[in-house]
Regions:
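Divalent metal-dependent hydrolysis catalytic cores, especially in the metallo-beta-lactamase
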Residues: 126-147, 164-174, 195-207, 216, ...
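C-terminal cap of metal-dependent C-N hydrolases
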Residues: 452-509
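Histidine-rich, glycine-flanked metal-binding segment
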Residues: 24-38, 47, 51-104
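Active-site neighborhoods of metal-dependent hydrolases
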Residues: 190-200, 257-419, 512-516, 520-527
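Bacterial N-terminal signal peptides
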Residues: 8-19
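C-terminal helical cap
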Residues: 45, 360-370, 375, 380, ...
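Active-site gating/metal-coordination segments in enzymes
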Residues: 172-222, 249-250, 275-295
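Metal-associated gating/positioning segment near the N- to mid-region
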Residues: 85-161, 179-185, 238-244
Length: 527
């Protein structure tokens, strides 16, 4: 997915000097969360480290300030715990009994747009949905609210003066320029200027090859990261293999990968009447793209996947954002929309020729069938890449195509499971792999001594059922024969600050209800 439609108009002119959309109000000062404390001990939990190791417990996790200082096994499973084997609580400390609970690292969402004027939602709404789903770190690819705004929010989050995940601002290539970038030196100057303004990396859709190569080279020199959505307007010149060679950190979605796998053709098989600015046409034809790529075992496939692995390249597939293309009714009627999808966001989702990602003008079984086959090939490549040692991360791109913030991220975990990932591999993709791709694995991504206390606490086992991470929980038939809801995140801990996840969800429901009351409606309208 992409940022504003204005960016695409400029892409069509091969200029790519995007105009920033109007920035939304910054988040209010923090009133939520308790801590950090001189010492906080989480008692008796089962731990999922995020490294790929199996769960173990009971464990006491000791946090001092914002850091994990001890991860101590305090007994055997299903056996009494000897108090003498437990870390002592210091004066002024706090302890939380988490017997029967699970603790995992905070989720790293590698593709999280904070939203903007187009979506009509506030930063508070987005941040609280993220934190309520255990998302403690988010890369904003593009900084659609402006680099100054995004960098400011990142600083405020780092200081914990707002209720928000930690933020990693990646500026959109060319943003802030009055005119298009036309030389490699201008690209280098732009990279340096963005770093000075607080950007940690760059997001691009493509560009003239010599200019884009210079930008990637300068990013490397400046120690910055990069993300690329290889849009169709430039992918014939620069596909994922080219940008990976230039030093691209992560590819977003799937664009550029099938094109790198072409054998016997050099461009997508576009029909003669194809128009990129007709989004149903664009995404309809995209559903036929993986069928044009070389298959596993072919010489071309093996050459491409081998080189990407050798380059240490990262895939950020964002399966979730295209899920509606294979099952529109399911996406449109997801149970969380009623309470958690803001009416203004719903307006943006409604089919429209003007709102990006709202391209379901006449989307039927033929398009969905193409995309179901597309997903099979796409998922097979991603799983194969992981199995051969490649890094795969979790990104949601919510705020488009019926994807609500927070919920879309958990859907991505389920889709990685569908692709063939073991639940522990899903957890690693959602935590440590994202931290590694951001160059932040020394601080976040796993439950280890010395790392920041970014943790998620659940009353249910997410390895047995990823659905317990949804804010709406999971329906289970109780012992009394009545269906009941279980799960949902209990606490999200960021920098040692403990957030009550259900309370954050109540705040979001209140925001949504208030907007509905203003409109005089109780339900989101369906077409």
């Amino acid at each position: 997915m992409t940022r504003p439609m204005r960016c695409f108009a400029l892409l069509a002119a091969f200029l790519l000097a995007p105009l920033a959309q109007a920035a939304i109000p910054a988040a209010p000062e923090r009133n939520e969360g308790e801590g950090p404390w001189p010492q906080l001990i989480l008692r008796g939990a089962t731990v999922i480290t995020g490294t790929g190791s199996p769960a173990f417990g009971p464990v006491d996790i000791v946090i001092e300030g914002d850091r994990i200082t001890r991860v101590q096994i305090v007994g055997s499973a299903n056996a009494p715990i000897d108090p003498e084997n437990r870390p002592a609580l210091k004066q002024g400390g706090r302890e939380i009994d988490l017997s029967g609970h699970y603790v995992m690292p905070g989720i790293v969402d590698m593709h999280g747009h904070i939203g903007g004027d187009e979506q009509g939602v506030t930063a508070e709404y987005v941040y609280k949905l993220w934190l309520a789903h255990g998302i403690t770190s988010v890369r904003d690819p593009g900084c659609g609210n402006g680099i100054e705004w995004c960098a400011s929010e990142a600083k405020r989050s780092a200081a914990n003066t707002i209720t928000a995940p930690r933020l990693f601002p990646y500026a959109f290539f060319g943003m802030g320029q009055d005119d298009p970038i036309t030389t490699p030196e201008q690209a280098r100057q732009w990279v340096r200027s963005m770093k000075a303004k607080g950007a940690l990396g760059m997001k691009c859709f493509g560009y003239r090859p010599d200019i884009l190569e210079a930008a990637f080279d300068e990013l490397r020199k400046q120690g910055m990261g990069s993300a690329c959505h290889h849009a169709q307007l430039d992918v014939a010149r620069v596909n994922v293999l080219t940008t990976a060679r230039w030093g691209l950190t992560t590819m977003e979605h799937w664009y550029g990968l099938p094109e790198a796998l072409f054998d016997g053709q050099t461009v997508q098989q576009y029909p003669a009447d194809y128009n990129y600015m007709d989004e149903q046409h664009r995404f309809g034809e995209a559903g036929k793209l993986w069928a044009q790529a070389s298959e596993k075992g072919s010489e071309r496939y093996e050459a491409v996947i081998t080189e990407l692995l050798e380059l240490g390249f990262t895939l950020d597939p964002t399966f979730t954002i295209y899920q509606a293309t294979r099952d529109l009714m399911r996406a449109r009627t997801a149970e969380w929309h009623a309470d958690y999808t803001h009416p203004a966001l719903w307006d943006f989702f409604t089919p429209s020729r003007h709102n990006h990602g709202s391209f379901f003008f006449d989307w039927g079984s033929e398009q969905e069938t193409d995309w179901k086959h597309n997903y099979q090939r796409w998922m097979a490549f991603v799983n194969d890449y992981k199995n051969r040692g490649g890094r795969v991360t979790v990104g949601s791109d919510s705020g488009y195509i019926y994807k609500t913030y927070g919920f879309g991220t958990i859907e991505e975990l389920e889709l990685l499971r569908e692709a063939g990932f073991h639940p522990l591999e899903v957890m690693r993709a959602a935590t440590l792999s994202g931290a590694e791709a951001l160059g932040a694995e020394d601080r976040i991504g796993s439950i280890e001594v010395g790392k920041l206390a970014d943790l998620v606490v659940l009353s249910e086992n997410p390895l047995a059922n990823l659905k317990v991470l949804y804010g709406t929980g999971h329906i289970r038939l109780g012992e009394n024969g009545e269906p009941t809801r279980v799960g949902g995140v209990r606490y999200t801990i960021k920098d040692g600050i403990v957030y009550d996840a259900p309370a954050l969800l109540r705040d979001v429901r209140a925001i949504v209800a208030e907007e509905k009351a203003k409109r005089g409606t109780e339900e989101l309208p369906q077409p």
